[in-house]
């Protein structure tokens, strides 16, 4: 950025002085009807926005510049935010012409985590800022949504856990102390995938005192956040960042809550991704996700609340039961559902309307929308308070107490106010006697002008005479050239035009002064009245926030009830046991997208219990699931995890019956891909995720593992999969679904009492394989990989060669070097037992003597065999084999 020198114009010096205060932001500098950018900002913005780069002359130099129209700036700001930029908005804060240089100030700084504009925000997504305070291995974090006023704080151990919580919230931006270790903060920001700002360390200090002052309370104990010094430091820094960027006191942030993992079902990033809760694995789309299926909400806050419940399912039986009671009542009463939906429709986004108004960024249309929403609350309260479920009745009760504010706003704000305050006319007649008087002067002026025009036409005989107005000359009389000889001597010439001349009279000048003074008075008075209304809203911010919370809860419950009723879901039994019993369970998303409809979906049972639980003797704790490719193993396992998640978020589930013993964490390792950015192979990603499961799972967890060990050699893979399964069975003892193509793992059922074998059934019809999609007791003997390859369209010659190689491997034919005979034309011979690929046996015996030994071993009664007899038998077998 160039130095601020006298060689620059006053306007450019003003720009450079402003830019110097915001070096890390792109400065939108208001010039008339455009926001202009200069120097490096122009180069950056023109490339990011794909707009024309021009130049402004400064002596012999050219200053790079580009601009966007004032009225279209929102869209350009949104695009810059998507690319991770900050934007400082510098507006004209006085009318042009009042002085030589218009006064300009930065009115707000828009960052990825500090967005209030409803045209930039996704109405159904929260917009979280994450502030982080680090001390040793512990971290405090605060989540702040500036657009709704929500503030939460908590503490976690370790950066890995911190990153997981920040990613679960989906933070858009991070804030760190300038005193924090730079390499560490960069690593955290990179892992979270969000831009980061470093702020003065003082903003993290004296946190409790500053928060008490902001919230107007003598103690924070009532908010449940005591004992969280690092969490409070992060919260104070988040509030300071909000106040600094928005240039206003954040009065809408009137409470703080504890961000705790004690009463929620934990889902790590891999699990949220694998289960496709909010984004699909393919393409990262919303369509095709569980959230898209569940979201039947009427309001935007309801949609955000539903997404929050999906990210933070409960681990508290009482709260789960309360939600289920409400869903059960509404799902069984279609009339009640429609009545509630109808009462919700007029309620606009109270949270975001309130935030914009309190922070000084709202307009008259926001006031009108708020008035309409508040007027609709009593009817909504009546509907909710008539229900039986406690959650619904409580929500209705929290909607009361805003009737006076609603009436005040409704009486003050015009039904259809203009888009900007500058246009005026947004205050209703009758709200202010002073304003009504001023408006009357302006409106009466139109009649006065018409009268003057008629009077002067009659007096002068100029039939084409017009009284006109422009911003340069004000009011004037316009006379065409052919009529100039009729102009009276008392008229004063103002301007000559191509077609005639313009004049004023003493009478017209007096009227102009009166009208223009009235317009100025009107604009100033309307601005004061708007500010008074805004302050009235801010004074009721806590009640409005409470009502907004109730609306969101009621809408989310209605959405879950609608889905339950329309899709035939049932109420799950959620208890304190360690069992998981799903009868005729279905995958909620898969059944919804089947071409032949949900009826074509094949339901499955999943019965499992933690080792040592009463139900474990029957169900087992670790289910080894085998079966062909494409048979549906992964779908069955995912649907079990989704049923648990739905039940613990308080939703009905797709099953005939479901009993869920409370789960503390769901872990899934289903599929993997290279993490090129971090230099990790597919196998490394798989092993990292598996290690996290083994370190963090408890006996109350649900673990879903698919194809552990497939990213390495067969022997390594089988060994790792076997050891992982043993650990989950012996050490963790949790409910585990373990899908594999390593059929050797079926032998675990003979060695471990709580292991059960299941397989997905198939039927062979001629040379075709029919996938039955049904989970049955027992194990699989084949994976039918070549049949799946045929379905995928591999060339016939490739399939034929694959079958040839498979036969060689199954027959254990080897070449002269003892290797499996895969290549054509190589001389083959039957392989010895030592060359068999199976880790745990199988295949034909090498010779008749070995057959006889095997028969003898199978016939032995081991319980009756003495040690000396065993040694004698071994010696005899050894001689026969030699």
Swiss-Prot record:
InterPro entries: DNA_mismatch_repair_MutS, DNA_mismatch_repair_MutS-lik_N, DNA_mismatch_repair_MutS/MSH, DNA_mismatch_repair_MutS_C, DNA_mismatch_repair_MutS_clamp, DNA_mismatch_repair_MutS_core, DNA_mismatch_repair_MutS_N, DNA_mismatch_repair_MutS_sf. GO terms for biological process: mismatch repair. ATP binds at residues 627-634. The keyword Hydrolase does not apply. GO terms for cellular component: cytosol. SMART domains: MUTSac, MUTSd. Keywords: ATP-binding, DNA damage, DNA repair, DNA-binding, Nucleotide-binding. GO terms for molecular function: ATP binding; ATP-dependent DNA damage sensor activity; damaged DNA binding; mismatched DNA binding. It holds the Pfam family MutS_III. Gene3D superfamilies: 1.10.1420.10, DNA repair protein MutS, domain I, MutS, connector domain, P-loop containing nucleotide triphosphate hydrolases. CDD domains: ABC_MutS1. NCBIfam families: mutS1, PRK05399.1. This protein is involved in the repair of mismatches in DNA. It is possible that it carries out the mismatch recognition step. This protein has a weak ATPase activity. Belongs to the DNA mismatch repair MutS family. This is DNA mismatch repair protein MutS. It comes from Anaeromyxobacter dehalogenans (strain 2CP-C). The gene is mutS.
